[in-house]
Amino acid sequence: MKSAEIREAFLGFFEEQGHTRVPSSSLIPGNDPTLLFTNAGMNQFKDCFLGQEKRAYTRAVTSQKCVRAGGKHNDLENVGYTARHHTFFEMLGNFSFGDYFKRDAITYAWTFLTSEKWLNLPKEKLWVTVYATDDEAYDIWTKEIGVPAERMVRIGDNKGAPYASDNFWTMGDTGPCGPCSEIFFDHGADIWGGPPGSPEEDGDRYIEIWNNVFMQFNRTADGVLHPLPAPSVDTGMGLERVSAVLQHVHSNYEIDLFQSLLTASANAIGCSNDNQASLKVVADHIRSCGFLIADGVLPSSEGRGYVLRRIIRRACRHGNKLGAKGSFFYQIVAALVAEMGSAFPELVQQQSHIERVLRGEEEQFAKTLEQGLKIIEQDLAELKGTVVPGEIVFKLYDTYGFPMDLTGDIARERNLTLDEEGFEREMEAQRVRARSASSFGMDYNSLVKVDVATQFTGYSATTGSASVVALYKDGQSVTHLNAGEEGVVILDTTPFYAESGGQIGDSGFLLAGDARFDVSDTTKTGGAFLHHGVVASGSLSVGVQVETQVADEVRDATKLNHSATHLLHAALRQVLGEHVQQKGSLVDSQRLRFDFSHFESIKPEQLRALEDIVNAEIRKNTPVVTEETDIDTAKKKGAMALFGEKYGDSVRVLSMGGEFSVELCGGIHASRTGDISLFKIVSEGGVAAGVRRIEAVTGAAALAWLNSAEDQLKEAATLVKGNRDNLLDKLTAVLERNRLLEKQLEQLQAKAASAAGDDLSSAALDVKGVKVLATRLDGQDGKALLALVDQLKNKLGRAVILLGSVHEDKVVLVAGVTKDLTGQLKAGDLMKQAATAVGGKGGGRPDMAQGGGVDATALDSALALAVPFVEQGI
């Protein structure tokens, strides 16, 4: 049996036993913030087992997509090197919420595994374990099912504590728990390993394929087990494992599902499909990456996004090891969709998105992969001993974007281990995100290297005098820049703010006699401030004195937006909750953009509350206070720090509205909150899983936005011959009149179609005693065609009808079969053929079906399918 057939057989079997087929939940747990990813079938039913949720059914069956990579359940480092470790797997499961219990659960499992109608596994190959004191389950297995005692194993507390056992399941230290019974398959004496509970149980001969968990107790804090009033059942069977059993192979990578992915991986890389660990890594990782992206996860430097990035980069590195040239990983998505898209339609819907995300991440990593591999080869060649120091591991992570487990893979191939504690110390000390090459043209920060510490005077001034200490052109040090040349100027002192903390760098100009350098941006590398721009006139040389001038209007507008960002952050935590954290920001002179963690879209009333809170703080006109202090003192005062930012011994604490907003910030700000004048949110939306974005304007820009909105209201009122006071009433009246006119139009179209039906019936062909009518009626919508098909069926008698129309640039199709023919000819079957022909899809009942497509040029060809459909079916 193929994997897809096994999945469907499992779901079908339990549906026959009265179970409701429940779709797989997302890989992002919706009801359990303690989980990084969904990793078991029972995750979506957790509240049902806890008695906190009641559903319309008490029996459920699922095929749940699961990921184990990152967090407590992390199989990543073993993937590709063992027969059964995966980052992604499918868990088949049946569940009872206070309905049936041990006897039925055991009987169902045995019947499905051994019945000739279902999997038909040889009974003598199956072993069973039960919890040591679970006599009830043992007796059911031996006395009712008939499993001989020699293939039954009692497993006690083998993990060092009461009820700490492979055969006793707990949800936590307290709560629902109970014994479990596992079913093992014996692969045969030619494979090393012993039965469960034996010293050789870790071998590959006896493989667990099904686990039945019997939740019958509630464990209280004192460790006492109390019987649950309504015991439940939670079972799980890995699809990949049972597929290996039924396909008579000993590795999950040999099953049909993986064979197609291995072939596609080899083709994309350009290597042979041999039994190579790296190829298995790629084939495994395309599943977890594809499904995670389909469920809304995007590569990032933290949380779920970072786990995804690690998996992608591990796959890229293994592809590189096999000789991949250029981007290859995204090319395997099509094979994944072909293999699993029918069971998980989200893959089909998201295919192009998945490919774009993978290709983008792959191309970004390719910029540093080759250089990073050279560095690690050099470091390992010079290594003394068998442990890779944490400093090297961190350097690869920080500079080249190598996740620790990717470096671990490389070390493992050389029988080396990593100094993980040393790596964690480096991470804790530095607190910086991985740095990768910029994708936005030349990055002067990475090219300009100068041992200069520029003195910043911009907190209190926008002008001043300074000396040019260095000049750079195309990343190379030069002694002068001439008119028209772009470059970088480094000064000994500057009022120009360097881009940091989301605030853009200052712009302005430098003057030295007849020379003028227009500054378009200011950045920072080390202690040096880099003034990017172009020489507008004259020539600029190292050592000359210049007069500095920041663009005041741009600076003033920018600092208002920056201060408003702090007020917004504080307001968000008030309105949405303390979980809100800044995930990114961009502050310029036009508007502010603020990204933050939040799990759902923001309601209109919440947006209004945010505006009200921020504007209230603005009206209070309190002073914006800055204080230089040490990091520990700042944190004790409640100052919020940005995750991933590096802070020195001395930090700048910015307070607004007393304790309303207290954050660490080195940016330029307003003097008082009243300077902001006005705050207006102009957009809100999601940018990634769990990340929302708000854009807003302040001051004069906010007033301009409101004036524009007022102008649009006036224009709309004029169009409906009203005014601002009665605009809503006027619009409602227009919409109601439009609705009535549309209804009248439908009625007229139906009458026209009915009249056309009289003419059309005479055009029907006689095919083997069946009236066949296939014609196009452009301009008619689906509703009109449905009514016409009903009318034609009554007029024609024994008939098959296929009508098509091009309506609003799309193809509309309706098929009908009179009921006396539905035993031989089904409208849904005809519709599938016709809809496919026009690049779409369709279906329906045996007597009536609807569909459509996008290829209007193929409509006549689609209609021509009706006659052969009848000829072949009668």
Swiss-Prot record:
Organism: Pseudomonas syringae pv. tomato (strain ATCC BAA-871 / DC3000)
CDD domains, per the entry: AlaRS_core
Cofactor comment: Binds 1 zinc ion per subunit.
Entry keyword Protein biosynthesis: yes
Similarity comment: Belongs to the class-II aminoacyl-tRNA synthetase family.
The keyword Ion transport appears for this protein: no
Record-linked SMART domains: tRNA_SAD (SM00863)
Function: Catalyzes the attachment of alanine to tRNA(Ala) in a two-step reaction: alanine is first activated by ATP to form Ala-AMP and then transferred to the acceptor end of tRNA(Ala). Also edits incorrectly charged Ser-tRNA(Ala) and Gly-tRNA(Ala) via its editing domain.
Example GO BP: negative regulation of DNA-templated transcription
Superkingdom of origin: Bacteria
Protein name in the entry: Alanine--tRNA ligase
